[in-house]
A protein has these predicted regions:
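N-terminal/domain-start segments enriched in small and hydrophobic, helix-friendly residues
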Residues: 1-9, 42-45
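Conserved acidic segment of CheY-like receiver
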Residues: 5-14, 20
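Short acidic, S/G/P-rich loop/turn micro-motifs used as interaction or catalytic elements
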Residues: 14-16, 58-62, 81-82
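A short, well-structured beta->alpha microelement
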Residues: 26-65
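A short, hydrophobic beta-strand element within the central beta-sheet of small alpha/beta folds
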Residues: 54-55, 71-82
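Glycosyltransferases and closely related glycan-assembly transferases
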Residues: 64-72
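Conserved small/polar residues in nucleotide/adenosyl-binding loops
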Residues: 84-86
Length: 86
């Protein structure tokens, strides 16, 4: 069996998203990492196929109905700047 995990990064900050993608690709080279700028882009894809979701704090606040049932798969990215909008 050749399982290839898929990881979603949902982050409006392109630089943050690309940096995290680069780190994850080095740590988990067998994984497929996909980036989305907003929640709607994720929903247009196949949202339930991901092994993990890396999301901004703002996206978690706005769409916690989706992420709360998937809390074991969800990693919230937080910084001092993220807290300004909450």
């Amino acid at each position: 069996m050749n399982y290839k995990p898929e990881i979603a990064i949902i982050e409006p900050n392109t630089l943050c998203s690309l940096g995290l993608k680069s780190i994850l690709e080095e740590i988990i080279p067998m994984a497929t990492i996909r980036t989305f700028h907003n929640f709607n882009e994720l929903m247009d894809d196949t949202p339930d196929m991901y092994a993990h979701y890396f999301i901004s704090a703002q996206i978690y606040v706005e769409h916690n109905a989706f992420f709360l049932p998937r809390k074991r798969k969800t990693i919230v990215l937080a910084s001092d700047l993220s807290l300004i909008h909450i």
